């Protein structure tokens, strides 16, 4: 089934080239189907790349999704045009009286700041509080996961001596959890962050369950009661080239950046990246949508 997006959204052409079924809102209105309402709060500066990455994954399911893109009203985005935001995005004020089946909160390059120092923290707190009563399930990614764990459960983040950067092996910590249906006991996921949350802190909160962990990268997947809140500290949505682009960006700036681990063939940045996380990335998003959104949401929101 398709994802329903604006016919002029640039990501639409990218997805169509990959044979991912997308549908315009105009066509969807002619069908007698109750599509799932999914909001994506896009905190990334590279908004169009993130749009394509997430739409690629949530579009690879049997479910019909009506996607709403959100941006922070209290933050000035410098890497995307105002025209793009005006054409394709809404703010929280635009949707605060609506209910959604699912919400995705992305990462953001602000992890070295204290949460309270982030210029849109107050607005984000309102959105996370809203999600508790107006969203069936919320998936938090990377810094978005750190922010959610901190806001909802008081779990702190800690600075790392070295950036966790690359593709890392993870072990499933809990069997027979719906979010991990079909997962291998060992699987890969990308990480790109300067801070961490710690296993002991997660296990110290009785409402939280640690689902997947990595010896090198640390905590990856955590879930709250009844799956209302899901936290992914890694970046299972990343495309093949994303880590390469981040590495080349920082290298060209003269920053002290290591080659991403377990990513390039033979660890040689002149060779092609080796994708080892795609299948589990698709499985993570499809399980979330199926078991924690579609199976749990009421027909009438």
From Swiss-Prot:
Residues with site note (Important for substrate specificity): 192
Pfam family, one: HTS
Biological process according to GO: L-methionine biosynthetic process from homoserine via O-succinyl-L-homoserine and cystathionine
Compartment(s) where it occurs, according to its Swiss-Prot or TrEMBL record: Cytoplasm
Residue positions of the active site: 142, 235, 237
Species, as recorded: Bacillus cereus (strain B4264)
InterPro entries: Class_I_gatase-like, HST_MetA, MetA_family
Alphabetical UniProt keywords: Acyltransferase, Amino-acid biosynthesis, Cytoplasm, Methionine biosynthesis, Transferase
Lineage: superkingdom: Bacteria
Disulfide bond sites: none
Recorded GO MF terms: homoserine O-acetyltransferase activity; homoserine O-succinyltransferase activity
Primary enzyme class: transferase
Transmembrane segments: none
Residues annotated for substrate binding in this entry: 163, 192, 249
Site features described as Important for acyl-CoA specificity, chain residue numbers: 111
Reactions catalysed, as given in the entry: L-homoserine + acetyl-CoA = O-acetyl-L-homoserine + CoA
Zinc found in the keyword field: no
EC number: 2.3.1.31
Summary of the function given for this chain in its UniProt record: Transfers an acetyl group from acetyl-CoA to L-homoserine, forming acetyl-L-homoserine.
Family from the record: Belongs to the MetA family.
Gene of this entry: metAA
An annotated GO cellular component: cytoplasm
Annotated metabolic or biological route of this protein: Amino-acid biosynthesis; L-methionine biosynthesis via de novo pathway; O-acetyl-L-homoserine from L-homoserine: step 1/1
Protein name: Homoserine O-acetyltransferase
């Amino acid at each position: 089934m398709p994802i329903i997006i604006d016919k002029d959204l640039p990501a639409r052409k990218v997805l169509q080239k990959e044979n991912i079924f997308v549908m315009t809102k105009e066509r969807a209105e002619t069908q007698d189907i109750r599509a799932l309402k999914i909001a994506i709060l896009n905190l990334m500066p590279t908004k169009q790349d993130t749009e394509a990455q997430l739409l690629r994954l949530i579009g690879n399911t049997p479910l019909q999704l009506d996607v709403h893109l959100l941006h922070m009203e209290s933050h000035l985005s410098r890497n995307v045009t105002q025209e793009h935001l005006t054409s394709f995005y809404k703010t929280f004020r635009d949707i605060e009286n609506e209910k959604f089946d699912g919400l995705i909160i992305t990462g953001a390059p602000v992890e070295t700041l204290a949460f309270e120092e982030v210029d849109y923290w107050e607005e984000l707190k309102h959105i996370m509080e809203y999600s508790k009563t107006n969203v069936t399930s919320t998936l938090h990614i990377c810094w978005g996961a750190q922010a959610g764990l901190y806001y909802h459960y008081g779990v702190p983040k800690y600075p790392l001596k070295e950036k966790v950067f690359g593709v890392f092996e993870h072990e499933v910590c809990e069997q027979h959890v719906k979010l991990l249906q079909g997962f291998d006991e060992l699987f890969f996921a990308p990480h790109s962050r300067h801070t961490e949350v710690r296993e002991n802190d997660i296990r110290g909160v009785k409402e939280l369950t640690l689902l997947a962990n990595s010896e090198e990268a640390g905590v990856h997947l955590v879930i709250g009661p009844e799956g209302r809140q899901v936290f992914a500290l890694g970046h299972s949505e990343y495309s093949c080239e994303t880590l390469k682009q981040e590495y080349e960006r920082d290298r060209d700036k003269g920053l002290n950046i290591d080659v991403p681990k377990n990513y390039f063939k033979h660890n040689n940045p002149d060779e092609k990246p080796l994708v080892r996380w795609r299948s589990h990335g698709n499985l993570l998003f499809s399980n979330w949508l199926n078991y924690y959104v579609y199976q749990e949401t009421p027909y009438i929101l």
